[in-house]
Amino acid sequence: MENTQENPATQSAEDIGSEKQAAQGAAPAAEAADAALAEAQAKVAELQESYLRAKAETENVRRRAQDDVSKAHKFAIEGFAEHLLPVLDSLEAAVNDTSGDITKVREGVELTLRQLTNALEKGRVVALNPVGEKFDPHQHQAISMVPAEQEPNTVVTVLQKGYTIADRVLRPALVTVAQPK
């Protein structure tokens, strides 16, 4: 009679041998997988660090920009104020003058007015004196209409000058306008 059944001891040894071979074959694959995993984890850590650096740099740029805007608002009038200081000096000198010479006072006031006008012009503040111009409701405020020889809707007199800054009206000129005939 033939024994078709294998020896359990032999079978176990064969199984153990094939398991060892499988384990030996799996060992390089596992090492390669572990190396790939370690490499991927290192890359993830590097990318996370780069992201955090970029995020911090972006925040620093935003903060610096806010500081620059804040300083610009805070000191925007500095140049204009520097141009006004000579006017202030002239007015203080006039107040302290005790000579009583009215001609001298008038000359001082005229000089101070020129200084102020120059300071305003340096600050891009320009006077509107529209006598003879067509009435413009964006730059002029009509106080009254008067009979005149000029064309209708033309500025006849300026009661108070208007002012613009960089083409924007600060104050409209108060004017009288020629009425239609």
UniProtKB/Swiss-Prot annotation:
One of its GO terms (biological process) is protein folding. CDD domains: GrpE. Residues 1-13 have a biased composition (Polar residues). Residues 1-39 are annotated as: Disordered. Residues 21-39 have a biased composition (Low complexity). InterPro entries: GrpE, GrpE_coiled_coil, GrpE_head. PROSITE patterns: GRPE. It is found in: Cytoplasm. One of its GO terms (molecular function) is protein-folding chaperone binding. NCBIfam families: PRK14139.1, PRK14140.1, PRK14150.1. HAMAP family: GrpE. Participates actively in the response to hyperosmotic and heat shock by preventing the aggregation of stress-denatured proteins, in association with DnaK and GrpE. It is the nucleotide exchange factor for DnaK and may function as a thermosensor. Unfolded proteins bind initially to DnaJ; upon interaction with the DnaJ-bound protein, DnaK hydrolyzes its bound ATP, resulting in the formation of a stable complex. GrpE releases ADP from DnaK; ATP binding to DnaK triggers the release of the substrate protein, thus completing the reaction cycle. Homodimer. Belongs to the GrpE family. This is Protein GrpE. The gene is grpE.
